[in-house]
Amino acid sequence: MSDSGNNFFILRRLFGFTKPYRSILWTSTFLAILLAPLNALTPYLTHLMVDNHIMKADLPGLQKMALLFVLVLITTTGLRYLFTILTNTLGQNVIKDIRNKVFAHLLGMKLAYFDKTPVGTNTTRTVNDLESVNVVFAEGLITIMADVLGLLTILGMMFYTSVKLTFISLVSFPLLLIASYIFKEKVKVSYQRVRTEVARMNSFLQEHISGMRIVQIFTAEKKIAAKFKSINKTYTRANLDGIFYYAVFFPVVEIISAASLGFMVWWGAKGVLGGAVTVGQLVAFPMFIARLFQPVRMLADKFNSLQMGLIAGGRIFHTLDNQEKDYDSGNIHLDKLKGEVVFDRVSFSYDGITPVLNDISFTLEAGKSLAIVGSTGSGKSTMISILNRLYEVENGVISIDGINIKEYDLETLRGNIGLVLQDVFLFYGSVYDNISLNNPNISHQQIEEASKTIGADIFFKVLPGGYEYQVTERGSNLSMGQRQLISFVRALVYQPNILILDEATSSIDNQTEAIIQNAIDKLTKGRTSIIIAHRLSTIKNVDKILVLEKGKIVESGSQQELLAHPNGLFSRLYLTHFDPIQA
């Protein structure tokens, strides 16, 4: 069993994040210790007021005691307010730090992790689970410690006031402890189910809202709605189970408390009549019982809150402990690479079983262009991914400028490779932000000059607000051509020496097509270029073409050389698959 599943270990790790806020932690702890006797003091003061002053008609003494009583109440209220503020401040600051750490950790994970982990699960870890962890500080350990100290202080004060009345009051106490234990165990199981269903629901919503276009195109709304209703029903049932346990537990506690109080009053009244119990003791003990049963009732709830926070903490640490980090950087750091790319007997599979690339070898000289063609699933996009070290090759070597890409640090490698994908991912923000990716070293002037260079400036300036136009999530308020142009400008401003272009297969208007072709010509000029080609206008100008089939290179050469073999795969693809648009 991993340490991340051990409650004590989770608690220790969570409190490790309190180091920058130790002053708040220790002040909260001190207040918890201070509040314990103050909470038990008011019933005892009531006992003294009745027996020593009211029963003896000592008005001056009663006034002094009443003033002390009010002072204790005001002090207790003020300290409890400060305690609540401090514990919640501690919790929010710790959650802020953990959330930053979780997100930074996710940014450094391999793509393989995201391939198998639903987006909703990571969202739940970063948002929902961390809100539950906040309970560990706001309502958890420190508050539980305060309640336990208060409980012990009240018991001590009760015994000091009257041993007999204390034992009478505690007759039903074992029943309360048993009820609290059963409640704690039942709610713990219920909460685990709720958290599991929340993650499942988040994943489902994230996936289907992102894919709403497909859902609507294939008129799958009713089926998706039915599936969501099923997930939602399971989630609701898990919540109702927890509500049921709460609905049963608190009335049971009230019944036990009322029975204890009634029995104590009956026995105490007999004691008053017989002279064994004073009136002040009888008046004070209902207050003692209320203060005794309240923390016990709340402790069961708070233990569950703590348990919920620890379960959520365990899930968070499971993510943080996941070692599927991005591949280690090498030690070679260079500002610019020349751009010679060599694949030497490279093989790769995503699952370690089914080969996607098999014994791929080719050399692309610096400044030359290469087109990769092949049917869907032949391995074209995979070659791009392993060149960027988004995945690691299993066999063979990929080198740039004669050096294994594993020896370059990732900043050098990826910083020298410009990537233009056919599925352009845009973030919510301005056109400027989507081009610069919030890089402060890229100025507005550079972006505008790059846009003019490839002819995209006219498209951006007609947008409301121009370059400040707010792009919605995934660029849904832009056309396919506009999204493509943003990716071209993005590649140009970063000035890579190696360009990888995955041409879009979607049809666009002739004007945009001409600008995109011009952009391709400008981007590839003088750069090592690898193009996954879908248009004749692109492949006719490249220096070399690779033809892939089932992860293997089956043909290579120039367009003229490959077309010289009419029965070859390239000739067949040329006639049946390529978009005949000419630049």
Residue ranges, per PLM feature:
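Transmembrane helices of ABC transporter permease
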Residues: P20, I24-L35, L67-V72, T76, ...
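Loop segments that connect adjacent transmembrane helices in multi-pass transporters
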Residues: T117-G120, R193-D241, I332
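Hydrophobic alpha-helical segments in the permease module
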Residues: F69-R80, F173-L177, Y246-S260, W266, ...
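Helix-loop junctions and hydrophobic alpha-helical segments within the transmembrane domains
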Residues: V102, L106, V215, I316, ...
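Membrane-integrated ABC transporters
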Residues: M1-N39, I54-A66, F83-T87, G91, ...
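Conserved catalytic Walker-motif region of ABC-type ATPase nucleotide-binding domains
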Residues: L106, F228, I316, F343-R345
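ABC-type nucleotide-binding domain
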Residues: D328, L334-A583
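Cytosolic ends of transmembrane helices, especially the final helix of ABC transmembrane type-1 domains
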Residues: A220, F244, L261-M264, R291-T319
